[in-house]
Regions:
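Short, mixed-charge low-complexity intrinsically disordered segments
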Residues: 36-94
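Short aromatic-glycine-(Arg/Gly/Cys) micro-motifs in beta-strand/loop hairpins
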Residues: 1-16
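Short beta-strand element of the conserved SAM-dependent methyltransferase core
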Residues: 4-6, 21-22, 43, 72
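A short, exposed loop/beta-hairpin motif centered on an aromatic-Gly-Thr core
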Residues: 16-25
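A short, structured loop/turn motif at beta-sheet edges
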Residues: 24-33
Length: 94
C-alpha cells in the first residue's frame, strides 16, 4: 500500500476539497478516490466516462468533476496493515 497526495484546482470556492492524503495500491486508484466518500449524506462513484456522480446522477461541487482533473503525487509507503482510502482531507468550509 502506498500513500499519495491528491489535489484539484477546478472547484476552488468555499465548501470544496483542495487535496487529500490517500492510501492506494496505485496512482490510478488514488486518482479515483473521492475525498469524502464516507459521508452519510452523499456518496460519489465514477461513471464509465470517468466523471463522479452521486445517486441522483449529479456531479460534485466540492471536488473535481472528472478523475482526469486530479493531480497525484507519490508520498511513500504506508505502514503495514493500512487499508485503502482517505487518510486526511483538506476541506475549505464557507
Amino acid at each position: 500500500m502506498k500513500l499519495y497526495l491528491i489535489s484539484q484546482n477546478v472547484n476552488n470556492g468555499y465548501d470544496t476539497f483542495d487535496s487529500a492524503v490517500v492510501a492506494a495500491e496505485s496512482e490510478q486508484e488514488a486518482r479515483e478516490t473521492f475525498p469524502d466518500n464516507n459521508s452519510e449524506w452523499r456518496t460519489y462513484e465514477l461513471d464509465e466516462d470517468g466523471f463522479w456522480v452521486d445517486e441522483d446522477g449529479e456531479n460534485p461541487m466540492e471536488w473535481a468533476e472528472n478523475a482526469s482533473q486530479v493531480s497525484v503525487k507519490y508520498l511513500g509507503e504506508a505502514a503495514e496493515g493500512t487499508q485503502s482510502g482517505v487518510i486526511l482531507a483538506s476541506f475549505n468550509a464557507g
